From Swiss-Prot:
Its EC number is 3.7.1.3. Homodimer. InterPro entries: Kynureninase, PyrdxlP-dep_Trfase, PyrdxlP-dep_Trfase_major, PyrdxlP-dep_Trfase_small. The lineage of its organism: Eukaryota, Amoebozoa, Evosea, Eumycetozoa, Dictyostelia. This is Kynureninase.
Amino acid sequence: MDKFFEYIKNQNLSLEDEKLADKLDQLDQLSSIKEEFYFPITKDIATDLSRVKDEDLDKPVIYLTGNSLGLQPKEIEKQLVCNYLNDWRKYGVEGHHKGDHPFIHIDEEIQASLSKIVGALPSEVCPMNSLSTNIHVLLSNFYKPTQTRHKIIIEYGAFPSDLYVTESQIRHNSFNPETSLIKIKPRDGEYTLRTDDIINVLKEHGDSVAVVMLSGIQYFTGQFFDMKKITEVGHEIGAIVGWDLAHAAGNVELSLHDWNVDFACWCTYKYLNSGPGCIAGIFVHSKHTESFNLSTDSRLLGWFGNKLSNRFQKEKEFVAEDGALGFRMSNPSVADCTALRASLSVFEKAGGIKKLAEKSTIITGYLEYLLTHKLKTTDVQIITPSEANQRGSQLSLLIKGIKASQLKVNLSNSGIVCDVRDPDVIRVAPAPLYTSFNDVKYFIQKLNENM
């Protein structure tokens, strides 16, 4: 919260000013970007319309769950109709090579803008598949267990799919998750992991660790791990280091190339706003793709990872496309890539991830300040770290005195959307693209009324 207090001081604002939210919105250079999005309206979201005032029925909701599914950018509708559907109608199969966005190169068009989101070279990223599939794809290449080095390290309480994928990869390689999967637990009475404890576990298991596979931001607690330091230590013990960035991509500043991360993957429907189930993304550091040898490379192969010049030739030996593109197996969905391209264009309009992260720090700090200073109950506990460099937009709130699921229902009747994770945690994410400071103030007002 220190960054928020520093901002208030630098802007000569007062925390006790009743119009503080108005003044913060006036200072917000990104305030107009929310006009780029469609918002659900209250009558379509509320659980009990009898509890909604008539004048509020058609009001846009306050959407605080972009960490689960981002709002729809208006640009997606435009590009799907005017580009994808129009080109398919107009050109048919020739659309692979005609039009402003030929189908055959549709994913390559996104590489440059996607690389800026995660701090990579364009050649190191590729939109493809879905997140869980991509974890399998990348682990099939990077997890090469031996009798002495066979362990995968994840965090305790990782997103279930990360657990299922790592367990199945271990079994697929004829090892036992009971002995080959290490889960790092928080200390007793704590919800988040201390960096020193993570490092100690890595060093304790040392040369028995094949892969370190953590979440960049922990989905339940909202903790942003020290990826740079953890990657360094992982390499010191001789392990490959990969990251699940589902809750980090589009949320915080990342420098995957400079941090020397081996691989990473993420979905694009949360903070990147591409749409439910839309195409995911991968990162493979350039050091791993400088050369390709079919006899020694263990990646899973498919026709779209093959060089375009070789792709339709019968009985030709596979020659990998350069960089991350060589990990593709199937042709990407043109509709998905069109949606992702459109959603990424909104990031460009906003000035990029750096500006968004700056606003995120301030607006999330404002949310934390109101929760700790203006809430009239002690039945709400923030379990997300207070330090700005250890979180993104999400604050996870442990709720007491009322079931979190019931509180979510009550808030929906007030035109507020957030989500619940058991046991009794509400996740609140003031995504900087479409959340105002007055939105945050209203949330606290309604939280007070419903606790």
